[in-house]
Amino acid sequence: MRTSPLRTRTRSLAVAAALAACLTTATTATAQEQEPDSPSTAAECALPGRTGWTDEGHDTDRAQFQRATGTHRVLTLFVDFPDAPATDSTDAYAAHLAPAADWMRTASYGRSRLDIATPYRQWIRMPSDSTSYGFDRGITFETHERYVRDAVAAADPFVDFSRYDMVYIVPAKAARAISFSPTYLYDPATPGITADGTRLKWAVTFGQDMWRWGYKVADHETGHTFGLPDLYAFTGETHRYVSGWDLMGNIAGPAPQYLGWHSWKLGWIRDSQVACLPASGTRTVRLTPVERPGGTKIAVIRTGETTAYVAESRRAEHNDRSACSTGVLIYKVDSATQTGDGPVHVINANPDTTPPSGCAPLDLAAFAPGQSFTDPATGIHIDVRRGGPSGDTVRMGKP
């Protein structure tokens, strides 16, 4: 979750209509299907952002969001409160979040590194009680910024903020009122927060839910500073859109590796690793698993100005070692859909299968060889032809 001035916009409370899909057995291509004369460039399948905030568009505003590549210098501050003083050491808190750095490095193929620093391992006393900071769902940007400003001011005598790109603010366990973990994204149009001559642009303010979600909550919230939206639903059934596929959905899901679409948006995979079909025709693509570096990562069929279908190969390894299903993951992307309203919909290849313990129905969504997806609204189809340890081969077509 993020807070921003834009959160005051009116949000639709209607639940998105169910995505119509046909799941069939793949058939041999007909004689009328034609491969394009020359492969399309990936740019032809890149979608523009239309929400003015975190979304699935490729034109991420780098004045608002930080780049997702390179080293990110993260300052960790440990805070307690007059009404909730800490009685334990900060060591366990630092150790709890430390694995987030390795997870991000693996997820990004080494292209994004979190240098999580803890130069001051003492508790920093906040000026106000924990109950005064309004940590409820729907917290306003102004209220959230006050919390961050107070933490920065209290820590300023002890650390040099000019040495860091972003801040993690970690509360004592005694501060039950600091319940959840929103991300602070600065507003360039306001004076904001400055310390040591440096404008503080990004901060993750952890809450007590960090102990329930585990260290990956840091990777999820840091993803918002890169411009990624929430893939879980803000209303209704929380995980109906993507379930445990992608960390921006269910943080504790069994297959949290970022979607290949997100890796492309963030610059972790190159245009040469994207197979694009923007116009009519067919194309056969050999996909390598998104959990590994190298090879073609996503096959994209563009269906409109802001919409596309994406196919990618998933395997139970690395960050996805607990995946409930493997094969080809197919999903619809809409870059005009706001965060929390379902900008990504995963297509379930096995809707009638009962999931085992620890898995949700949509966690079994991966397509196997011989299965096919057709969208009745657009006529596009994706057939899974082959699969094996090295990846999957799909044939995608557009009338």
Language model region names:
Residues 100, 106-109, 113-114, 238-265, ...:
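N-terminal short leaders/motifs
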Residues 33-210, 219, 371-373, 379-386:
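Zn2+-dependent metallopeptidase catalytic core
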Residues 1-32:
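Secretory targeting and sorting signals
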Residues 80-83, 173, 252, 315, ...:
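Non-catalytic surface loops within mature trypsin-like serine protease
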Residues 161, 166-168, 174-320:
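Extracellular hydrolytic enzyme modules, especially secreted metalloproteases
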Residues 35-37, 42, 47-49, 54-58, ...:
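Non-catalytic C-terminal accessory/binding modules of secreted extracellular proteins
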Residues 71, 241-243, 325:
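Short, solvent-exposed loop/turn segments at the edges of secondary structure
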